[in-house]
From Swiss-Prot:
Annotated protein name in UniProt: Arginine repressor
Compartments reported by the entry: Cytoplasm
Main location: cytoplasm
Domain of life (superkingdom): Bacteria
Keywords: Amino-acid biosynthesis, Arginine biosynthesis, Cytoplasm, DNA-binding, Repressor, Transcription, Transcription regulation
GO cellular component: cytoplasm
Taxonomy of the source species: Bacteria, Pseudomonadati, Chlorobiota, Chlorobiia, Chlorobiales
Function per UniProt: Regulates arginine biosynthesis genes.
GO molecular function: arginine binding; DNA binding; DNA-binding transcription factor activity
Presence of keyword Transmembrane helix: no
Matching InterPro entries: Arg_repress (IPR001669), Arg_repress_C (IPR020899), Arg_repress_C_sf (IPR036251), Arg_repress_DNA-bd (IPR020900), WH-like_DNA-bd_sf (IPR036388), WH_DNA-bd_sf (IPR036390)
Similarity-based family: Belongs to the ArgR family.
Xref: PANTHER family: ARGININE REPRESSOR
Pathway assignment: Amino-acid biosynthesis; L-arginine biosynthesis [regulation]
Length: 149
């Protein structure tokens, strides 16, 4: 099952229904044709920032943070990047010490079809593009989303 599609459905269900918890959401997902294990749903909640809030009547309701939070996160991640360089096969992002994992994770969560994945060390992220023919455009895309010159 496609993670992005699953998370899109989770967002839709949580935003459009009064969902009180994970078990209720698991049932709703099942009715929509998504077979999801509880640990997977927990990871999705963490990645998406879904929280459980108390309602006025004393119950609980799941909620998804607004999208502008993504813009704030993008700005913060961008401040951790020192440089972005590329050769004919890969892209390297140099970060502040200890920040490479966060930058790599941010890029992975974007789910861009142009990026196969990232490998992060302490202060360096290796970006693996979907094709080496588009290295320049992938580098430009990363610079744009991280607001780098």
């Amino acid at each position: 099952m496609n993670k992005a599609l699953r998370q899109k459905k989770i967002r839709e269900l949580v935003e459009n229904n009064d969902v009180s918890g994970q078990q209720e959401l698991l049932g709703m997902l099942e009715k929509e044709g998504f077979s999801v294990a509880q640990p997977t749903l927990s990871r999705d909640f963490a990645e998406m920032g879904i929280v459980r809030n108390r309602t006025a009547d004393g119950g609980y309701r799941l909620s998804v943070p607004e999208e502008p939070q993504e813009d704030i996160l993008r700005g913060l991640v961008g401040m951790e990047v020192l440089s972005i360089t590329a050769n004919e096969t890969s892209i390297i992002i140099n970060t502040l010490p200890g920040r490479a994992h966060g930058v790599g994770s941010f890029l992975d969560r974007i789910n861009s079809p142009e990026i196969l994945g990232t490998i992060a060390g302490d202060d360096t992220v290796l970006v693996i593009p979907a094709t080496i023919r588009k290295i320049s455009s992938v580098k430009s895309y990363i610079q744009k989303i991280l607001s780098q010159p």
